[in-house]
């Protein structure tokens, strides 16, 4: 079996040790050569956009004078998770450029891959929490308590970060740099101690990391859409109102973007697990899964720099927060501005 992508790179043949082209199947050498040449540039572009975009989003959330809402607490944590994630991408770009010859030592092998793996879980768990929050506000509005929900949101985010760290522990522990004589490289690989670990990994990655969260996301968002249709997006002010409708539009877009970007990776990761337990075999499935994992990994990477774009173009409340922050930092913000004048300025700013 050839290599997996950066999220769970395990350069391997039947002994789970050799990177791409070290197996008997080598039907797509040109495709691999193209990937080694082009993907590092793509990864660095994702890193640059993700670093700037998520730093901007976090700055807006953290520097604003107003206290963060529940939705904004979750969104700020999602931006922080994406920011931590993209910090590991330059290491992986160099690794791909070197054809998986890891140049940074065993410690960074564990740290970079562990952080990337933790982000996989943290991101999707945060999307579940965001969806559940919108579900609570729109479907069961009377049960929500604003002050109490803020404390719950903060505690939920802390638990999500802890869960992501715990679920990525095997990556921190079992990742290591090993020589692969067939290719004359030292690869950063995942050394599973027993074949039964492949089943555990399948449960962890595909079930806990995608299918169960996906079921929850679909449940919450289907009920949200049904509730919006019933109400014609006219929610009584005590239960939500225009502010919640705008937040819901942003969150539904984020959820859709997340699923589109991450679903291909989990599909190919599932195929890779089937290969490891010998449920599928043959050169076609080997090449198809290996190349698919590489490409789907980078479609998942796109999500980390796409979220800030969604905030700006879909999140009207986020844009308003940006404007308020600009006014706050401007010397002219010290001068009093009437409420009607502020509304007029904001309306003109976002119409243009």
UniProtKB/Swiss-Prot annotation:
Extracellular topological domain residue ranges: 1-39, 98-110, 178-198, 272-290
The organism of origin for this protein: Oryctolagus cuniculus (Rabbit)
SUPFAM superfamilies in the cross-refs: Family A G protein-coupled receptor-like
One GO biological process term: response to mechanical stimulus
Cytoplasmic-side segments: 64-72, 133-154, 226-246, 315-352
One Pfam family this sequence matches: 7tm_1
Location (main, coarse): membrane
Cellular compartments annotated: Cell membrane
Gene Ontology molecular function: bradykinin receptor activity; C-C chemokine binding; C-C chemokine receptor activity
Induction: In response to tissue injury.
Keywords from the named record: Cell membrane, Disulfide bond, G-protein coupled receptor, Glycoprotein, Lipoprotein, Membrane, Palmitate, Receptor, Transducer, Transmembrane, Transmembrane helix
One annotated Gene Ontology cellular component of this protein: external side of plasma membrane
Cystine residue pairs: 109-188
Lipid-anchored residues (S-palmitoyl cysteine): 329
Keyword S-adenosyl-L-methionine: no
Region (Disordered): 1-24
Family under the similarity heading: Belongs to the G-protein coupled receptor 1 family. Bradykinin receptor subfamily. BDKRB1 sub-subfamily.
Membrane-spanning residues: 40-63, 73-97, 111-132, 155-177, 199-225, 247-271, 291-314
Glycan attachment sites: 13, 21, 184
InterPro entries associated with the record: Brdyknn_1_rcpt, Brdyknn_rcpt, CCR1-9-like, GPCR_Rhodpsn, GPCR_Rhodpsn_7TM
Function: This is a receptor for bradykinin. Could be a factor in chronic pain and inflammation.
Gene3D superfamilies, per the entry: Rhodopsin 7-helix transmembrane proteins
Keyword Lipoprotein belongs to the record: yes
Membrane topology: Multi-pass membrane protein
Name under which the protein is recorded: B1 bradykinin receptor
Ranges of compositional bias, category Polar residues: 10-24
């Amino acid at each position: 079996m050839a290599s997996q992508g950066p999220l769970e790179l395990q350069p391997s043949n039947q002994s789970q040790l050799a990177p791409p082209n070290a197996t008997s199947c080598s039907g797509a050498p040109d495709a691999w050569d193209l990937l080694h040449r082009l993907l590092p540039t793509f990864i660095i572009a994702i890193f640059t956009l993700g670093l700037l975009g998520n730093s901007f989003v976090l700055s807006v959330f953290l520097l604003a004078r107003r206290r963060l809402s529940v939705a904004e607490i979750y969104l700020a944590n999602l931006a922080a998770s994406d920011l931590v994630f993209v910090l590991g991408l330059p290491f992986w770009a160099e690794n791909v450029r070197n054809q998986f010859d890891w140049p940074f030592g065993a410690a960074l092998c564990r740290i970079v891959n562990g952080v990337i793996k933790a982000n996989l879980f943290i991101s999707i768990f945060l999307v579940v929490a965001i969806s559940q929050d919108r579900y609570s506000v729109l479907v069961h509005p009377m049960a929500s308590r604003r002050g109490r929900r803020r404390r719950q949101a903060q505690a939920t985010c802390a638990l999500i970060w802890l869960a992501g760290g715990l679920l990525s522990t095997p990556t921190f522990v079992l990742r290591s740099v090993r020589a692969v004589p067939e290719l004359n490289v030292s690869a950063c690989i995942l050394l599973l101690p027993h074949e039964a670990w492949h089943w555990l990994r399948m449960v962890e990655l595909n079930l806990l990391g995608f299918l169960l969260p996906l079921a929850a996301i679909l449940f919450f968002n289907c009920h949200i859409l049904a509730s919006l249709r019933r109400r014609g997006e006219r929610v009584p002010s005590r239960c939500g109102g225009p502010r919640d409708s705008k937040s819901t539009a942003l969150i539904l877009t984020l959820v859709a973007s997340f699923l589109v970007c991450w679903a291909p990776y989990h599909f190919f990761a599932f195929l890779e697990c089937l290969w490891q337990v010998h449920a599928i075999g043959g050169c076609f499935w080997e090449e198809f899964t290996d190349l698919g994992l590489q490409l789907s990994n980078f479609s998942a990477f796109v999500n980390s720099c796409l979220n800030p774009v969604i905030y700006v173009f879909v999140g009207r409340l986020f844009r308003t927060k940006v404007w308020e922050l600009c006014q706050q930092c401007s010397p002219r913000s010290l001068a009093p501005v009437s409420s009607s004048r502020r509304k007029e300025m904001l309306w003109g700013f976002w119409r243009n």
